Design a protein with these regions (language model features):
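Conserved catalytic-core segment of NTP-binding enzymes
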Residues: 1-98
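Charged catalytic carboxylate motif
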Residues: 34, 114, 118
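C-terminal boundary of histidine-terminating zinc-finger modules
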Residues: 102-115
Length: 131
């Protein structure tokens, strides 16, 4: 769903049975305001929050360093603040973008890629919440 807690989001959770929500956000302070409102909306409507994901949390430069251009740790901190599971950090990555543009998930085309392993780790955590 788009960010926020407006009519679209509220109608969606009221009209469709949802087993759980995964909140995905960039780590910027402004985006985290929407995350907090989203958590509150899901709690008020009785939708279980399966966890939070920090998207575009960093990119790895040619020098091997991680650059955190959108901030650092805000999504994980928010998960702790609201006692929700933090599912992981997803980096900016050219291979991920290319696979998405080609319509072929990276986890399928390159299952041993480090980003594929991050996605699979997150998927395992989500699966555990249903067991």
């Amino acid at each position: 769903m788009p960010p926020g807690t407006g009519d679209t989001q509220l109608t969606f959770v009221q009209e469709i049975k949802i087993d759980g929500a995964i909140i995905v956000s960039t780590p910027q302070d402004l985006a985290l305001l929407d995350v907090k409102r989203g958590i509150q909306m899901f709690e008020k409507t009785g939708v279980k929050i399966l966890g939070l994901i920090d998207n575009m949390s960093f990119f790895e430069g040619d020098d091997g360093k991680k650059y955190k251009i959108f901030g650092e740790g805000g999504v994980e901190k928010t998960a702790k603040e609201f006692d929700k599971e933090f599912l992981g950090f997803l980096p900016l990555n050219e291979d991920l973008r290319t696979s998405a543009d080609n319509g072929e998930p990276l986890t399928y085309s390159k299952p041993d890629h480090k980003i594929s392993k991050i996605f699979l780790g997150i998927a395992k955590k989500i699966r555990q919440s249903f067991l």
